[in-house]
Amino acid sequence: SEVVHAGIYYPQGSLKARLCVHGKQLLYAYCAERAIAHRRCGKLIVAANEAQARELRAIEQRAVANGVTDLRWLTRDEARALEPALECQAALLSPSTGIVDSHGLMLTLLGDLEHAGGMLAVQSEVESLQVGVGASEGAIELEVNGAGEQTRLQARTVVNAAGLGAIALAHRT
């Protein structure tokens, strides 16, 4: 999505909330260090009426409980100073929400992986998976089918990026 999330909406103490709050700091630092295009552009969460303003206060409380420290409540006039065409009752500004060039980020992460001796197997289906086999104890052995070609891989660490199939793949061990 190319969005750097602040951790505003998730249930208090949830993994998503913790990862967003801590992860955004790490991501911004990594992007700056590696010259990956990104911007802390912020985000306005807008309440059009009094009922929505009450909901916005609940969102603010949840965010603060999750460790989001930079939210700012805006009056109608303060919000309009940022966005003159905006019609609202109130708004919540999240200045640490941002955007990142996901393509640049992925290429940089891939370079880091390869520099560390790792490899990426794209468009490959895991045919079999065994843990604790091979020369090194705890090794993971995979049989992978990529473009009709069977390959056997052995690794100490495997990142399961199977999307919606990730849980099913994890249960195959």
Regions found by a protein language model. Give the residues of each.
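Amphipathic, soluble alpha-helical interaction motifs
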Residues: 30-33, 119, 172
